[in-house]
Each structure stands twice: as structure tokens, then as C-alpha cells.
From Swiss-Prot:
A zinc finger (UBZ1-type) spans 653-679. This is Calcium-binding and coiled-coil domain-containing protein 1. The gene is Calcoco1. Belongs to the CALCOCO family. It comes from Rattus norvegicus (Rat). GO terms for molecular function: beta-catenin binding; chromatin binding; RNA polymerase II cis-regulatory region sequence-specific DNA binding; sequence-specific DNA binding; transcription coactivator activity; transcription coregulator activity; zinc ion binding. Residues 1-190 are annotated as: N-terminal AD (CTNNB1 binding site).
Length: 691
């Protein structure tokens, strides 16, 4: 009987093999489940091979498949995977032990499974034993393995359905909580939007208040600047007025000085004219003297010859020249005396020119000062008008600002109150959201736990399903083997029937020979004058077949009392019973439907063989032994009744050989066959499909 090892296989490198069976049926796919330890990175170059137990090298594998790489792996948790070995590559059935080995890409063995075999299933492998304690007495039940697997599968399916219902309920709760959270988030978003709008309004009012305050400050600053400018302009006007007065006084003094200088200049001009006249006169005299000197020199040149004559005249002339030289020196001295006067006159003229220029400049400056004063007065008037306008505007702005400030304070109070209410509402919503998030987190953790448990149960169910499929495959293989054996038994049965027909012919031939010998013996006895009733002899002569018994035997029976009494019992020592035909007993009234009731034919053959005697049974079924003889002996009474009447009896019930359940004889034969197939859980489709 095939047994599965549900315990984890020992591993060298941490790889564990799960649900490794002790035996596998050949010509069927083998599914290998294994678990990679945490921290192991699976690779597409890793492979799982089927090795002989004594194999010492990784190259001594019988077959292998590449390992499957999971799409998602979780750090810190083991990784489950499975591979399938195709039926065409599996070893032949035998006593050789094999094992799975996980080999990584470096060629190192990371894990191996317990040993197992490949062999054909035995008939007893289809049954399992269950021990139950009921009322203190131990009961040993033998049931088909398919039934146990079906019950386990039903329980797993029921548990899976319960978990799925629980999962659906949790998902509904999570959906409701999410909808509640979304509603609260929408309300929170609305409150936040209102709060943001109020904040924007508050910021706008604060901004407008700040702008008004800045404008007021700017206007106040401008007013201060204008007042300072007015004061500065007034100071400048006063300073300009003082400067104008000083300039006027200085101008008067300069005018007086200019007048004095003009008079002095006129006086100096008069003196200069006199000096010039004197100079001109002196120059004229000097010119005259020079002309005279030239004339005298000429005369002196003319008179050189007469020098002696005119010595006295020359001396006189020398004196006159000396006198003229003295006069010329005096004139030159007077001219030299006139030079400082010329310089003084020139300085006075320059001073007068500079005074005139200064006076012109002072006039121009005075004119510009007067224009500046006029402009300053106009600007002062305009500034006073602007200051008055600014003061009026400032008063209006102050009044508007006071009104805005009152309205702002009211709005600020209302906004603060609404903000406080919104804050309280937001705090409540935050607390509600935190509580809901905590609830959702708990639900998520619980859902994750249920999902993990469901995944674990699903993996277990898948493993059990694969095990059940494997068991079902083995059952199908066993059923195919049974069908082959049944076909072989049918062939043997046909051969046995053929042999029985031949044996029947032989038995009829032997019976005819014995009957002929008996008839000859009786004729001899009749001839010898044996005493017999005449009526009896006449009846025997008329119908000798009436002496035949309804039952038949192949040999003489020691106990003659078991046979019915005959008319010749007192005179005959040996009774030869004419055997009834075996073929009619086997075929019965429904000979055409013998192929449809094969089990009844086998029972009829066995009962006929047993009723005819142990020697005949040994001749007919030498290879079956005494087991079938004992089973068939239980039907001896019905067989004898059939033999006594000469008509095969139809059984009133059809009985299942496994559970002994009875079916009416007139019921359809398919009902019994379907009932028997139900014990083996045989179906062409998979019984369960897990989604």
C-alpha cells in the first residue's frame, strides 16, 4: 500500500522536500514540492534531479528538470516551489531506491529527499486502515483510500469555503470602512477647503489692512517730508532774503566805491592827461633837441674844420646841450614819476572793471534769487495746497481705515470663532480618521493574517489536491491493471468454457459407453433368468432414460443413501447417473446475454464443478485450489435444487462483493456496476477544481 511522507525531508543546504511518497507509479507524472530557506536566492540555473541513493556524483542523475524561479519573493520567509517530472523520463519499476536532490548553479547539492521507489500498485494498496475507539472497544476499519482522500478533500474544500466566506465578509467590512474613510476624507477636504477659503479671506483682509497701513504710513511720511520741505523752503527764503539784503548793502557800498573810484579815476585821468601833455611837450622838445642835436651834429661835422673857429661857440653849445640834457633828465625823471601813477590808474581801472563785473554778477544773482524766491513761494503755495489735500485724504483714509478696522476686527472675531470651530471639527475628524485608520490597520493585519492562513491552507489544499490527483492517477493505473487482469480472466474464462465443452463431450461419451455396458449386463442378467417384475422390465424397455437421475456424477459415490431410491436399488450395486448437460446449466435461459452477466457465469461454473464432486472440480479448475471450492460450496443447496428440477434457478438478489449491498435481480446491471465503480472513485474528469 502506497504511503506518503508528510514530514519534511532532511536537507544539507537548507532545501526541504515536501510530501515525498515512498513509492511512485511508473508512466505517470511526478510532482516534486520543495521549500527554499530564507536568504536563499533561487536561480534559473539550479536544477532538481532524480538520483540513485548510492550516486556519489551530480553527473550520475537519471533525469532532471530546471528549478522554477518564483515571480515574487518575501525577505525573511521561506519560498515554496514545485516542479514536474514527465512520465516518459522516469525510471523503470523495480526495487532500486531513488531520491530527489537540489543542485545549485555551482554544482553543489543543497538538499535531498528521503528515498523512494517506482513500482506498480498492489491490490491491497487501494485500502487504508482506520482505528476508532467506540465504547471502549477498538474497531479496525478497512476503507478505500479514495474515500479517505475524498473526505479529506471535502473537509479542505469546506474549510476553504468557510475561509473564503470569512474573507468576503472581511472584504465587505473593509469596503465599508474605506467608504466611511472616503466620506470622512471628503468631509475633511471640504472643511479644509472652507478653512483655506476663510484663511485666504483673512489673508486678503490682512493684506488690504497692511496696504492701507502702508499707504497711511507713506502718506504720513510724505506729509512729514512736505512739512520739512516747507520749513526748509521757509528757511531758504529767509536765508535768501538775508542774502539779498546783504547783497543790496554790499551793492550800495560797491556803488559808492565805484563812484569814488570813478572820481579818482577822473582825477587820475586829468593828471594823466596833464602828464601826457607834459610828456608830449617834453617829447616834442626832446625831438626838437634831437633835431637840433642832429642839426648840430651836422653843423659839427661841417664845422669841424672850423672847430677852432667855433670853439667858443661849441663850448656854448655844449653848455646848452648839457642844459638840455639836464632838462631831458628832469623830463625823464618826471616820466618815471608818472609810471606809478599809470600803474595805479591801471589797477583802479581793473578794480573798476571787476567791480562792474561783480555788480553785474550780483545783479544777475539777485535776479535769479528773485526768480527762485518767486518759484519757492509758488512751490510753497503748491506744497501747502498738496498738504491740505493730503490732510483731507489722510482724514478720509483714517476714517475709512477706522471703519475697515472695525469691520476687520468683527470679521476677524468671526473668523477666529469659525477657525476655532473648524479646528475642533478638524480635531474630531482627525481623531475619527486615526481611529478608522487604526481599525483599518487592524482589519488589514487581520486580513493579511487571514490571507496568509488562506494561502497556507491553499498551499496545503493544493498539495493535498496534487497528492489526491497522484493517488487518483495511481488508482486509475491500478484500475487499468485490474481491467487488464479482467480481460486476461475473460480470456482464461473463454478457454475454460471451451475446455468444459470438450470435457462435457468426453463425459457424455463415457456415460454412453457405461450405459451401453450396463444395458448389456442387464440383458445378460435377463437372459440368465434373474427375477424382476414384468411391469418394471417393460417400463425400462420402453423408456430407459427414466432411470437417469437429475444430478450427475463422474465417479461412484460411497454414500448411496444420498441418491434418490430407484426401482433397481436392491438388485444393483453400482449406480451410474446420467449427467445433465453442463452448457445449459451455465448458459441458463439467458444464453444470449452471457457476456452481460460474467460474474453469474463464473459462479454457475464454480457451483456446477463443486456439485459434481471434488474430483471433477480438480479436473476442471486445477489451478484455482480449494478457495473457490469453499466459496462455491455455499451455493450447493441452490445448485442441487437446480439439478433436481432440471431448470437453473434465478437468484432473487444481486449482491455487491465489497460492501455486501443487495440489488433486485430484475434491476439494471449498470446500477451494480456504477455502485462498484463508486468504491474506486473512478472518473474521467477531475473531481474537484480549485479556483
Amino acid at each position: 500500500m502506497e504511503e506518503s511522507s508528510l514530514s519534511r525531508a532532511p536537507s544539507r543546504g537548507g532545501v526541504s522536500f515536501l510530501n515525498v511518497a515512498r513509492t511512485y507509479v511508473p508512466n505517470t507524472k511526478v510532482e516534486c514540492h520543495y521549500t527554499l530557506p530564507p536568504g536563499t536566492t533561487p536561480s534559473a540555473s539550479d536544477w532538481i534531479g532524480i538520483f540513485k541513493v548510492e550516486a556519489a556524483c551530480v553527473r550520475d542523475y537519471h533525469t532532471f528538470v530546471w528549478s522554477s524561479v518564483p515571480e515574487t519573493t518575501t525577505d525573511g520567509s521561506p519560498t515554496h516551489a514545485s516542479v514536474q517530472f514527465q512520465a516518459s523520463y522516469l525510471p523503470k519499476p523495480g526495487a532500486q531506491l531513488y531520491q530527489f536532490r537540489y543542485v545549485n548553479r555551482q554544482g553543489r547539492v543543497c538538499g535531498q529527499s528521503p528515498p523512494f521507489q517506482f513500482r506498480e500498485p498492489r491490490p491491497m494498496d487501494e485500502l487504508v486502515t482506520l482505528e476508532e475507539a467506540d465504547g471502549g472497544s477498538d474497531i479496525l476499519l478497512v476503507v478505500p483510500k479514495a474515500t479517505v482522500l475524498q473526505n479529506q478533500l471535502d473537509e479542505s474544500q469546506q474549510e476553504r469555503n468557510d475561509l473564503m466566506q470569512l474573507k468576503l465578509q472581511l472584504e465587505d467590512q473593509v469596503t465599508e470602512l474605506r467608504s466611511r474613510v472616503q466620506e470622512l476624507e471628503a468631509a475633511l477636504a471640504t472643511a479644509r477647503q472652507e478653512h483655506s477659503e476663510l484663511t485666504e479671506q483673512y489673508k486678503g483682509l490682512s493684506r488690504s489692512h497692511g496696504e492701507l497701513s502702508e499707504e497711511r504710513d507713506i502718506l504720513s511720511q510724505q506729509q512729514g517730508e512736505h512739512v520739512a520741505r516747507i520749513l526748509e523752503l521757509e528757511d531758504d527764503i529767509q536765508t535768501m532774503s538775508d542774502k539779498v539784503l546783504m547783497k543790496e548793502v554790499e551793492l550800495d557800498r560797491v556803488r559808492d566805491m565805484v563812484k569814488a573810484l570813478t572820481r579818482e579815476q577822473e582825477k587820475l585821468l586829468g593828471q594823466l592827461k596833464e602828464f601826457q601833455a607834459d610828456k608830449e611837450q617834453s617829447e616834442a622838445e626832446l625831438q626838437t633837441v634831437r633835431e637840433e642835436n642832429c642839426h648840430l651834429n651836422t653843423e659839427l661835422q661841417e664845422a669841424k674844420g672850423r672847430q677852432e673857429e667855433q670853439g667858443a661857440q661849441v663850448q656854448r653849445l655844449k653848455d646848452k646841450v648839457a642844459h638840455m640834457k639836464d632838462t631831458l633828465g628832469q623830463t625823464q625823471q618826471k616820466v618815471a614819476e608818472l609810471e606809478p601813477l599809470k600803474e595805479q590808474l591801471r589797477g583802479v581801472q581793473e578794480l573798476a572793471a571787476s567791480s562792474q563785473q561783480k555788480a553785474a554778477l550780483l545783479g544777475e544773482e539777485l535776479a535769479s534769487a528773485a526768480g527762485a524766491r518767486d518759484r519757492t513761494i509758488a512751490e510753497l503755495h503748491r506744497s501747502r495746497l498738496e498738504v491740505a489735500e493730503v490732510n483731507g485724504r489722510l482724514a478720509e483714509l483714517s476714517l475709512h481705515m477706522k471703519e475697515e478696522k472695525c469691520q476687520w476686527s468683527k470679521e476677524r472675531t468671526g473668523l477666529l470663532q469659525s477657525m476655532e470651530a473648524e479646528k475642533d471639527k478638524i480635531l474630531k475628524l482627525s481623531a475619527e480618521i486615526l481611529r478608522l485608520e487604526k481599525t483599518v490597520q487592524e482589519e488589514r493585519s487581520q486580513s493579511h493574517m487571514f490571507k496568509t492562513e488562506l494561502a497556507r491552507e491553499k498551499d496545503s489544499s493544493l498539495v493535498q489536491l496534487s497528492e489526491s490527483k497522484r493517488e487518483l492517477t495511481e488508482l486509475r493505473s491500478a484500475l487499468r491493471v485490474l481491467q487488464k487482469e479482467k480481460e486476461q480472466l475473460q480470456t482464461e474464462k473463454q478457454e475454460l468454457l471451451e475446455y468444459m465443452r470438450k470435457l462435457e463431450a468426453r463425459l457424455e461419451k463415457v456415460a454412453d459407453e457405461k450405459w451401453n455396458e450396463d444395458a448389456a449386463t442387464e440383458d445378460e442378467e435377463a437372459t440368465a433368468g434373474l427375477s424382476c417384475p414384468a411391469a418394471l422390465t417393460d417400463s425400462e424397455d420402453e423408456s430407459p432414460e427414466d432411470m437417469r437421475l437429475p444430478s450427475y456424477g463422474l465417479c461412484e459415490r460411497g454414500n448411496t443413501s444420498s441418491s434418490p431410491p430407484g426401482p433397481r436399488e436392491s438388485s444393483s450395486l453400482v449406480v451410474i447417473n446420467q449427467p445433465a448437460p453442463i452448457a445449459p446449466q451455465l448458459s441458463g435461459p439467458g444464453e444470449a446475454s452471457s457476456s452481460d452477466s460474467e460474474a453469474e457465469d463464473e459462479k454457475s461454473v464454480l457451483m456446477a464443478a463443486v456439485q459434481s464432486g471434488g474430483e471433477e472440480a480438480n479436473l476442471l479448475l486445477p489451478e484455482l485450489g480449494s478457495t473457490f471450492y469453499d466459496v462455491a460450496s455455499g451455493f450447493a443447496v441452490s445448485s442441487l435444487s437446480e439439478a433436481s428440477t432440471g431448470v437453473p434457478a434465478i437468484p432473487a438478489w444481486k449482491e455487491c462483493p465489497i460492501c455486501k449491498e443487495r440489488f433486485p435481480a430484475e434491476s439494471d446491471k449498470d446500477a451494480l456496476e456504477d455502485h462498484m465503480d463508486g468504491h474506486f472513485f473512478f472518473s474521467t474528469q477531475d473531481p474537484f477544481t480549485f479556483e
